[in-house]
């Protein structure tokens, strides 16, 4: 893809703890997004699904400097990773599904100048999640119960500067899909 965007609204954190919009006059966002998947039947009741995704997304400020001190022109937008990838594997059997998901996010800048100081960038990180799901087919509905364990290796990471994300955490879901 190759996009030229006018008036890109960039939400950046402030020193007061909230996000504030900032207008970036002109942005050139380009790159490649790749996706692949494979479905394999392993006998009558077993199935395996593999999904892979990769994105290369430079997003560059190509507008005019807003002041003499503006060093953001020609630089990657803050908090936008250049590279991201994910791999997911799902094994299914008799209404049960076990999945493993691995994600990667490249280094992200926290300042529009792409300053390489300690606070000017967030390091790359890798994330792993697992889930177990059971689906039940009833005459009038489909019920599903799902348990997720996110960040199973307790990776320390930041999505926004000075705001650590949770370590290992859990989610439970119940789904009801009526059959009308």
What are these regions (language model features)?
Residues 1-4, 20-109:
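Gram-negative outer-membrane beta-barrel transporters
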Residues 10-18, 64-70, 107-114, 150-156:
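Flexible, solvent-exposed coil segments and beta strand-coil junctions
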Residues 48-51, 75-180:
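Conserved C-terminal beta-signal and adjacent last beta-strands/turns
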């Amino acid at each position: 893809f190759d996009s030229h965007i006018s008036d890109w609204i960039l939400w950046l954190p402030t020193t007061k703890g909230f996000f504030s919009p900032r207008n970036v006059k002109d942005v050139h966002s380009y790159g490649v997004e790749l996706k692949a998947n494979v479905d394999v039947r392993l006998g009558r009741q077993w199935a395996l699904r593999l999904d892979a995704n990769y994105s290369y997304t430079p997003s560059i400020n190509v507008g005019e400097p807003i002041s003499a001190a503006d060093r953001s022109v020609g630089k990657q937008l803050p908090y936008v990773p250049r590279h991201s990838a994910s791999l997911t594997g799902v094994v299914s059997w008799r209404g049960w599904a076990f999945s493993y998901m691995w994600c990667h996010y490249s280094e992200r800048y926290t300042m529009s100048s792409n300053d390489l100081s300690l606070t000017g960038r967030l390091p790359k990180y890798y994330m792993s999640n697992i889930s177990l799901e059971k689906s039940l087919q009833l005459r009038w509905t489909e019920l599903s119960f799902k348990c997720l364990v996110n960040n199973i290796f307790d990776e320390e990471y930041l999505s926004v500067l000075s705001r650590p994300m949770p370590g290992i955490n859990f989610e439970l879901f119940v789904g009801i899909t009526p059959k009308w």
